[in-house]
């Protein structure tokens, strides 16, 4: 009997050893097989976490953070390194969460940005994705909880078959879509998720209700997250829940149910939930190819929201605010249903909320009846019974994520924004930076022009541009040339004569046509505003077209300088990227051409692109700032042009944002 037992034990030990060798061989016999795959990027993200000893933000989520987090922006605004573990939610939230434990240190911030199945999804792991993701990086298996080992052992031979049959991946769901050094998504997603309703069965829907139509967090989930909270806090780090971005059109429950989930989580688990999830319910034009995947614009908006959340809860310092108050007039919003939208500045007092009807008459709206303000978070939303136009009625017809502009009596695409946009006059406590003087860029102006302005003499400023310079889609006075005229006259107590040579639909060739006419008028300063119409189309960044644009601008600059006319070059912003003729690379390239010409000729370049980019992180430009959903700014949007131009007229060096009524301060 004893011999039999010894034999049995020896046999079992041999079997275990042989099996372990087989497992080891399966995992390590062929290295880096899945290196090109999307899921294998988890190895890079894990190594970044391992090696980052600086204070850091650890993002734990599924693919909503691989497709929706601008890590550079987050690092610059917070001062923390970012380790973004966000990848395929099919790994299981348990896996991402366990990986994060590898290197949580004092002062770190752990963010739980799980997608909306987290409340009942901490019991399973995705063996196929995890094993192919880890590949031959055996050390990562230590983060698989022991009670799940049997599942991975059982999957081993299927994994071996997949490994032998694997073909390299490419495209957006592959390693090539990401930056190796930090795991940042770099693949351009310049399209809207316009096919959602055509493929709703494939994309799915989002609801946070259980089978009984109740908001619930399972015991397993609550126990795990409570333990995770304790683990993080024992290491003197902070942990917060944050909302993931999600496609609003896919939501089948009430948006108030998301607030109930927030309350239930804080009461049950006790992790501070620092987001308003309603702000993260994005429209199709901010999403790309899945319910939780932002496009390139949505990624910026989501990151900006997250930064706001971190500031509001005190996790990172907020910008210093003074007790000085300034008015902001006419900031515009396009409001959908009862979803909130952020103000550019947190309002102190709402002065007036209004819009215009089809006849062009002003319509006033009432707080508490038509809209609700969250003064702490700085948001506005419609009420259920609001008479404010609902932007959900705005129509855009897309094809494959892009729209074609159509202007005919029978059909117009897309709808213009004017009828839907809400305008708000309010005041706010300015930041300390708004009390500081603007940078003095007046050296770009001639001594003669500076002398005239400082001595109260009349000056003449001319503008040659396209439809933006002509004030298209504005009320006639609400465009940047008018704002500049007003600002200079009020600030310096001078008379400014303006000459506008701009013409809708034209490109930089107009500048060449009007050379002599402009010279004959002898302006002191000429502002040149071209590029929006020059750069469009698939071949917009071709050498031939870029060279033609550059030659037109530079030839004109040289001629005007020879005639003692100061020149200012005005850049242009990123128009709606989902328009089928937009070329985002050309937008950046043409702005760089302008900057290069300005630098070489020692003239001022107004960086409109950067100002609009910063505002676009807070307010989706196409909805909230464009009058036509494409590229014509509304009256408030034109103030952003003034913001980019005015530094060159800060001649005495004393101009401050707080002193300029139409200047929009952008952090």
Where are these regions (language model features)?
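Hydrophobic membrane-insertion alpha-helices, especially the h-region
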Residues: 6-26
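Oxyanion-hole/transition-state-stabilizing segment in secreted/luminal serine hydrolases
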Residues: 104-131, 182-212, 462-464, 470, ...
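Secreted/periplasmic serine-hydrolase-like ester/acetyl group-modifying domain
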Residues: 127-235, 529, 660-667
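Active-site segments of SGNH/GDSL-like serine hydrolases
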Residues: 228-254, 529-533, 556-591
